[in-house]
Amino acid sequence: MGEEHRGKEIAHWADSLYLGSNVRVHPLHTEERDGHTVLTVAVDGDYAALGVTEPFQLDWHIDLAGDRIARLRMVEEKLDLPAPVLGFVQAMNMYDLDSMVSRFAPDAIANDQMRHYAGREAIRAWLAKEIAGDRVTMFVTEILRHPGGVAVLAKVTGDYDKTGLSDPLELRFYFTLAGDAIAQLVVIPAKSH
């Protein structure tokens, strides 16, 4: 980032960064903003080659000229979240089950729309089936801090059955923290359907 490439340099840059360093990019959200398309992506891969230590999000600001990309600007999207919650969001967007589970305290509880899970193993089973298994991603649209944690409003999409649901689905994630771990996660619809 902070570099400019033109013409054939673009292909060399893209090949070396995205192919040469084993980088994975997962689209999370697309919107029109200030006259151009903004594609938010989660980025994961060879951290040493990328010069980072964990997954991160980028906003790709795309200006089109007809059916071609005239300009692409990449802006790192920083989420102001406590470390365990940020780690959970990043892991969820990469379908990384072990990393998601590691963010929870051993005696944590989770409640996903009136379904209760107690302890890491029960939470792991839920996350394996319904989050990583259904390739669910979340695009954070609002962050509200509360005593003991944070509430996150997010647009959620994935390979789950969307019958009767909006797409993307908006959910609220209420995280309660204990030290550097998630002690409780409650997931509810942002509004009734």
Predicted regions and their residues:
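Hydrophobic/anchoring residues in structured secondary elements
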Residues: 30-32, 74, 110, 143-145, ...
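Short beta-strand edge/turn micro-motifs at domain boundaries
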Residues: 57-79, 170-193
